[in-house]
Amino acid sequence: MYSIKMRSSNQDIHISGAETICEFDKIEQTVQRFYNKGFFHENGQPDFLNIKIQKIMEPIKQIKALQIIEDDKANLQHLTQKCGVTEQALNQGMTYIKNETVYTGAIILSAISGKRLDSFGHRGIRATHFSFEDINNKGDLNERVTDALAIASCINAHPYVKGELCVSDDLTYTTGYFASAKIGYHRLFDIKPVNTRYGGRIIFVDDRIDLNHYILFLESTPKQVVYETV
């Protein structure tokens, strides 16, 4: 199995990213797909694109995908409250998402105080080395949803994670999500105005979490997210 990652940017501003884990015979078509995504993206033409291929040398951890909850009227404040995220922490998370700073990874905040707990600056924390397998093989989820669900499932695979809020920085995509192990994966429609580049990923955690161990899991452990519907 091989890990394949793509990142593209323009003047150090993030344009697009993608990754997966696949068999050797799928590398060529995966690289072509990532190349097309990186160079032909609505966020603009990149001046830098990097594709990295690395053989997986350790066991791959299986993670059960979060359940997708279909609720067109999902309310972010109600969802976060159910998961133990305070209004103060949510407001601080939205401040990070709406400011002009471009973070290339997730920001980890205390679910109680909203204080930032990681020390990675603009880089943030990156959930990497993962793939997504739909064992139903129905093909009823598009690529954007499978990528988001895979990341959300990895991020929430820890007992001290209260939930994750994600808002895409793509210009015309205005749907975000809030996800947690407790209540599943909820899409949030019209969470931002169209034709805006702000966005981000916020992880709300219990202050007792072992950050070093959690970050090592997100960034280094190979993970396969398995999606199954009843």
UniProtKB/Swiss-Prot annotation:
This is 6-carboxyhexanoate--CoA ligase. Homodimer. Its cofactor is Mg(2+). It catalyses: heptanedioate + ATP + CoA = 6-carboxyhexanoyl-CoA + AMP + diphosphate. One of its GO terms (molecular function) is 6-carboxyhexanoate-CoA ligase activity. HAMAP family: BioW. Belongs to the BioW family. One of its GO terms (biological process) is biotin biosynthetic process. InterPro entries: BioW (IPR005499). Keywords: ATP-binding, Biotin biosynthesis, Ligase, Magnesium, Nucleotide-binding. Catalyzes the transformation of pimelate into pimeloyl-CoA with concomitant hydrolysis of ATP to AMP. Pfam families: BioW. Signal peptide: none annotated. Pathway: Metabolic intermediate metabolism; pimeloyl-CoA biosynthesis; pimeloyl-CoA from pimelate: step 1/1. Its EC number is 6.2.1.14. The keyword Transport does not apply.
